Amino acid sequence: MERKGGRQAELSVITKAKDLCSYILTVTEKSPKRFRFTLTSRIQNHALNIIENLYRANEVFLTKGDLSALDKRLEYQRQAMTECKLLSYMSLVAREQGAILPKQYEQITSKDYDVQNLLGAWIKSDDRRVKN
């Protein structure tokens, strides 16, 4: 994938994760103060950790048959997946406690689901590419 100027296009999973993070930062900014340093900061941290782990995974160069590189990339991908699941749970708690609105929760879970699906597809693709 190439863009103008010879720069590579970003992975769609990273783009979706950035959209998720941006939405979360916007939504949690308006959360009640009593949740700001507990639930909302943890939700924000999970969103940022997802992006961080995706970038780390993408920086691991894979070649056919290089199982050690695959393991390293897979570790970052799994960390990102775990962060997605934790984000989903924390968002549920935030909705139940009134830190975010039900519609905001729906948006977060929808965006999180997209990231998880794309991440799962990336993991499978890497596995096929390296092992075949």
Pin down the residues of each PLM region.
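Amphipathic alpha-helical assembly/interaction segments
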Residues: 1-132
